[in-house]
Design a protein with these regions (language model features):
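A short, basic/flexible loop-to-alpha-helix module at the beginning of a structural domain
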Residues: 85-100, 263-269
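A short helix->loop->beta-strand "cap" motif at the edges of active sites that frequently abuts
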Residues: 124, 305-309, 343, 381
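Short gly/pro/ser/thr-enriched loop/turn and capping motifs at secondary-structure boundaries
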Residues: 133-139, 287, 309-311, 316-320
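Active-site gating loop/helix substructures
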Residues: 221, 225-284
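Charged helix-capping and loop-helix junction motifs
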Residues: 292-299, 325-330
């Protein structure tokens, strides 16, 4: 009905303009107006036709504006039934986020998704480059059964960047229970697996999945090839498979990919090249961050990049992977695998951890990571100490605190909010 009202308005505007400019095909209407004026006034008034035309134009424009307003409201009600009153806020938010810096994040596991939940509040120009070496759980089973790259970490990143209803997030994270073949699989993993087979390509599958979840940014696998992560221990033994590495509880000398030369996803390299800032972690040092650096071209792209390159250090050591590691040892391991210049700065926690929580983690063999400042300085890396944790029943990085401090570093390592910053020269 509003479109009909708009059409009536257009007709009235056209009629009014014709009357104003004395269009010849409206002689009948003009004559009728003259007769009416003559009967009313007793004389002819040629200005009345012009005034009548102007009045008709005004009425027509008014009807068009009213119709347009209600048409827009009807469309918004359909597309945004619960948020129609927030349209201006939504438009403003999208414009603000669209002007944010280009940030590329590298990693995998739970830690990366925590960072993404915070970063998406500062910019929508986010690219997550995700490890594909996972071989455990639902991801490992789908990898073996369907021959696809493991979808678990990709799913977590999609959900973290999603701007959708909580129910959709719960759906993608839902794990089937019971004793059937579906037991242990998450719906999101199955969805990505199905989308990959339907589209024939995992990159396309992720793009289409991003539309379903209204993702802010993009999620990219580091590679589309099937890879295995192996670890060489200090005693020379080799452990095959990402999920088996922490189980042996030996000191890791180095990790490697099999096959040794793995082709990268070009879109991932482009995201790193075009980034204003590149963030590594947080996440498992050897099993979430390192596999990305071992993909051909990734470490080289990082070294050549002029972006601010930040490593977010873990808060606690990880049993079987980083036992006894200090902050500088985390950074040195990254430099040993990726080369000098893959990171410029570190973000480390300086918030105290309660004795009760330390005792709880000590039972699992995990301890707070010591920030050894002099050793970090010796590596030529700048660092920022800040409160970046959320201590509840477990110790986790806090998304908002991570975002605030990362953006501070991206904007120039400005001090404030009770944190200490230490700038070192950037690598050339």
């Amino acid at each position: 009905r509003w479109l009909l009202l708009f059409s009536v308005g257009v007709m009235l505007v056209s009629l009014g303009l014709a009357l104003v400019f004395n269009y010849k095909y409206l002689d009948v209407i003009e004559e009728a107006i003259f007769r009416a004026v003559y009967l009313w006034k007793g004389s002819y008034n040629y200005m009345f036709t012009t005034l009548a035309g102007i009045a008709v134009v005004i009425v027509g424009v008014g009807l068009m504006l009213i119709a347009t307003r209600f048409v827009i409201r009807s469309v918004i009600t359909v597309l945004l039934p619960d948020n129609s009153e927030r349209l201006v806020d939504i438009i403003y938010e999208k414009r603000r986020l669209g002007k944010g810096p280009n940030i590329a994040v590298i990693g995998g596991g739970h830690g990366l998704s925590v960072l993404l939940r915070g970063i998406k509040a500062a910019t929508s120009n986010v690219s997550a480059v995700v490890t594909v070496a996972d071989d455990g759980g639902s991801s490992g089973r789908l990898r073996e059964d369907l021959g696809i790259i493991p979808p678990g970490d990709l799913r977590n990143c999609l959900v973290a960047l999603a701007d959708t209803e909580p129910l959709m997030e719960k759906l993608f994270q839902y794990r089937f229970k019971g004793k059937s073949e579906l037991a242990g699989h998450s719906f999101g993993n199955l969805f990505i697996a199905a989308m990959t087979e339907v589209t024939g390509d995992v990159e396309t599958a992720l793009r289409e999945s991003s539309k379903v979840l209204a993702v802010k940014g993009e999620v990219l696998p580091a590679s589309k090839e099937h890879v295995r992560l192996d670890a060489i221990m200090d005693d020379g033994t080799v452990v095959e498979g990402e999920s088996h590495i922490p189980e042996v509880h030996k000191h890791i000398r180095r990790v490697k990919l099999f096959p040794p030369h793995v082709q990268p996803v070009q879109a991932a390299l482009d995201a790193l090249t075009n980034a204003d800032a590149i963030i590594l972690g947080p996440g498992s040092l050897y099993t979430s961050i390192m596999p990305n650096l071992l993909v051909d071209g990734v470490a080289e792209t990082l070294r050549k990049s002029k972006a601010v390159k930040i490593y977010i250090c873990n808060v606690m050591t990880q049993p079987g992977e980083t036992d006894g590691y200090t902050a500088s040892m985390h950074a040195k391991a990254i430099l040993d695998h990726g080369g000098q210049g893959v990171i410029d700065y570190m973000l480390v926690n300086n918030a105290p951890i309660s004795k009760e929580m330390q005792a709880y983690y000590a039972k699992e063999g995990a301890y707070p990571v010591e920030v050894d400042e002099e050793a970090i300085n010796a590596l030529g890396i700048g660092f920022l100490k800040a409160d970046i944790i959320n201590e509840s029943d477990v110790i986790r990085h806090d998304p908002q605190k991570l975002c605030r401090n990362v953006m501070k570093m991206v904007d120039g390592l400005r001090p404030g909010n009770g944190s200490d910053h230490y700038m070192r020269s950037r690598h050339n």
